């Protein structure tokens, strides 16, 4: 079976076919999570989001109670929240999202360098998930 595949692969290469390359997605890691002892019913969650060159997040919204402060750790991030125009943020800059916001664009603005940010959520203890991707058009 292995030898039978070799001529097929060679034919595909000769005809100019190339293997499909899946675009890398962002990587999200929880840095910490803790109940806020002086604010009953609230918790703080910090996540790092790392984008390979050219990577982007799907349009999404966050938990309804989530206030989010984002700080760009490295690279350049393009972000569009709600109906505001998209903005570019560089390492050392920050932005925030109000509860209930729709995050239309969140992506690495560079196709050559990676980018990362720290997102700090203040959210109701029982509210979740933190992020929900929009449904694709035509899906149910």
Sequence positions of predicted segments:
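Short acidic-glycine-tyrosine-enriched beta hairpin
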Residues: 36-41, 51-53, 83-100
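Extracytoplasmic
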Residues: 41-46, 64-67, 84, 100, ...
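Glycine- and acidic-residue-biased ligand/ion/polar-headgroup-sensing regions
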Residues: 65-84, 91-93
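Ligand-binding loop in jelly-roll beta-barrel domains
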Residues: 78, 85-86, 100-127
């Amino acid at each position: 079976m292995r030898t039978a595949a070799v001529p097929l692969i060679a034919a595909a290469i000769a005809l100019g076919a190339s293997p499909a390359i899946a675009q890398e997605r962002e990587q999200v890691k929880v840095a910490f999570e803790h109940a806020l002892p002086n604010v009953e019913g609230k918790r703080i969650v910090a996540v790092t989001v790392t984008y390979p060159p050219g990577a982007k997040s799907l349009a999404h919204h966050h938990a309804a109670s989530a206030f989010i402060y984002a700080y760009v750790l490295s690279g350049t991030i393009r972000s569009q929240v709600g109906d505001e125009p998209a903005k570019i943020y560089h390492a050392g800059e920050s932005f925030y999202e109000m509860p209930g916001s729709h995050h239309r664009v969140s992506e690495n603005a560079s196709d050559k360098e990676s980018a990362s940010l720290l997102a700090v959520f203040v959210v109701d203890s029982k509210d979740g998930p933190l992020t929900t991707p929009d449904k694709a058009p035509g899906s149910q």
